[in-house]
């Protein structure tokens, strides 16, 4: 057994209001640069939809994640070494810019400089890639916001598998939920296995997956290999980039920017201890629907004296173990089993988990359209199909989703009877396997959600690091493996790049 620590995240979808504050703050901090205009390390999707980039969940098309072989081993779905080498100059599984969207800005200056005329001047869109005027904006990162497109397009959502999707196109049966997405910082990252240059690595001290900008050569196989499509190619620098989980903040014991600025208090950060020796065994599980339960077995009890002794022997600092004992992620994923992984069938063992959302139930239950099991509504009859949530979070296994939803409903029923009627309804807790202490703690974490409960992040022990971070302090900032310039003048073979036109200057001088 080899114990390692991982900073994990849980998002409570039952409280997400779809405000995009997380997306905007992340964008302003990390990707508001030339070459990354189209990239959103964090984005919020309205499900059901095909997402950003288009149909990212369709691995038959994009070849992301891992696939299990007949002999029980796993390989990246993109192919082995020979297939990657054969396609290294022309990757057939690479999303194009149209699959994301062509980033644009508007000619606001024209509103000030336009001559007098009969009609009011308008700010027309221009591409931030070519600088040319765009006649029509065709797509965007949240184009399907709040079910904004026709159902014929949204029914391509892969989570509709084994569901009669057409009936949910009717107004009376429609449903919606928000899904914030970011890099999963997987225990078994397919992007790292797909990179020909070996530029992607997973940090031992906190599990954050990063791209070494010195080693990256822009082959872009990692983009295809990542099933969540959370790696982006910077066309300015010629390098791939991804969510860095705000590791400078994590090292200082602070939450990520998206978690810090979340309006709905839906994000939780905490430490998980796991057995690194079992990753290959668990990722190779034969039945996809068993992957969720198998991944739970990897996580170790931070209060177990044997685990603590082994963790200290493996170099895990005592402060990290102390944080793991107070981790909200461990409580929600392992203790209470409320949080579930996003698409575990990709076999990457993701570490950003989600609490499934409850559907609007009060009026439906009162009208008799939702059945009741005692004081708890029947979760099989809720507005969001149970099968849809299972396809999204547990590879189609409905039992863990049903258990999580029942426990959320039981907590509400118990607290309602306690606050309104002044009685403790213990029967509703026994039916879902919870104790009074667990429910009171769930209420504190989910409903009250104090800052100190949501974020338990230990400061990094940089004295144990291989590199001297102090020597690079205040040096280059967020550069790209080419000194402090931010972009390289040479291509991957060392030859001088062709001159690039400055898009911002071009926008100012080009005429129609």
Model-based region annotation:
Residues 1-512:
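Non-ligating segments of multi-cofactor redox enzymes
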